[in-house]
A protein has these predicted regions:
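Hydrophobic alpha-helical transmembrane and interfacial-helix anchor sites in secondary transporters
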Residues: 82, 141, 175-176
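Hydrophobic core of transmembrane alpha-helices in multi-pass small-molecule transporters
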Residues: 117-136
Length: 246
């Protein structure tokens, strides 16, 4: 229904940008995008350096970078398909931190980490290939904006939060922490752990919002609902006849 709310030559200005930024209903997904990819980005940046520190040659290091990419693509396609198939976002996205937390914990606290060559490479490869929920979140933002105008802006804002997370990721591993990066891996462990309650909070938040809308909607008569559909000034995801996906 919202596809007719603007034409293809209508510009989006500062007012629309401000409204999208202040749409607190999408803040939980922005927060997810901000922290969800920090772990992968951090280790991905230093993966070749870590492999060389383990004693691999440049040629071997290049070859050993292939398995994480294959695993990453496989998980990306699989988890995105599962989310659409099950029509579920929060719980499916939980697969990512539940997969990553044990791995980064082993990488951080196992005494053989950084010393036992192939075991260390395997752990890093599995961590780098973790389920990637970016595609789920991009679609999630688009659906929960419920407006053609705000959809494009909100998607751009989401990507801005992802990029801010990437900037933070570049500053977690430090020179004084080389080569085992114990401090950095502790931070990554806490970040991955934080994603679990954040996803659960997001699920509960959208269920609560839907329940609040449902109470008001159910109090209306059919005539009142029809009048609301035609004349209400509510826009986007604030409309009572819109249900948040979670």
């Amino acid at each position: 229904p919202t596809k007719g709310s603007m034409n293809n030559r209508q510009a989006l200005g500062i007012k629309e940008l401000g409204a999208s930024l202040m749409d607190y209903n999408l803040w939980p997904i922005f927060a997810i995008g901000f922290i969800a990819h920090i772990g992968k980005s951090t280790m991905g940046t230093y993966f070749t350096l870590m492999n060389k520190e383990l004693g691999f040659s440049t040629f071997e290091t290049n070859l050993l970078a292939i398995p994480p990419s294959i695993l990453h693509i496989s998980f990306l396609l699989g988890i995105t398909w599962l989310s659409e198939r099950a029509n579920e976002r929060s719980f499916v996205s939980l697969v990512a931190p539940l997969y990553a937390v044990p791995l980064i914990a082993i990488i951080r606290w196992w005494h053989g980490s950084g010393k036992q060559v192939w075991a260390t490479w395997m752990l890093s490869t599995l961590f780098l290939g973790q389920p990637y929920i970016h595609a789920i979140c991009v679609a999630w933002v688009s659906r929960n904006s419920n407006s053609v105008g705000s959809r494009s802006i909100c998607s751009a804002l989401y990507n801005m939060f992802v990029q801010m997370g990437a900037i933070i990721a570049l500053n977690i591993y430090r020179e004084d922490d080389f080569p085992l990066y114990k401090k950095g891996n502790t931070i990554l462990f806490l970040i991955e752990l934080l994603l679990i309650p954040l996803l659960l909070f997001t699920k509960c938040f959208y269920i609560w919002k839907n329940n609040q809308k449902g109470k008001l909607w159910n109090k209306m008569t059919e005539e009142e609902r029809e009048y609301y559909r035609k004349h209400s000034t509510d826009r986007g995801n604030e409309r009572l006849d819109f249900v948040f996906e979670h």
